[in-house]
Amino acid sequence: LHSFPTRRSSDLIQGVVQKQYPDSYLGEDEMADVRKHMIFHGRVQGVGFRYTAKYLARSMNLTGWVKNEYDGTVVMEVQGREAMIFELMKGLNRNQFIQIDWIDTEEKETETESSFEVKY
């Protein structure tokens, strides 16, 4: 289980992406699909988080789902290339209404699916 805080300025996510995926990184692992189970904490409900995630994920050919929880968090499972998942995180962090304070992340087994959906 990995947890990392984020800042509104997106500096932290930018730093994580740059450390894990420097410009010279072009290994085979970049092309392998991974699946991540993520729990987002912060101002993540009532701000278009799920629909932004769906739009971005579909535009990046990622699969999975996103769902609001009763405790005010948003849970998402997303599958695809790890670099694209981090691009999704950067896109979510750029939204002016979404305030991600913390993300709990766990890697899961990949699944066979063909789209990204909002669960209710």
Locate predicted features.
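Short, small-residue-biased leader/transition segments that mark boundaries at the very start
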Residues: 2-9
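Intrinsically disordered, low-complexity, mixed-charge
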Residues: 12-120
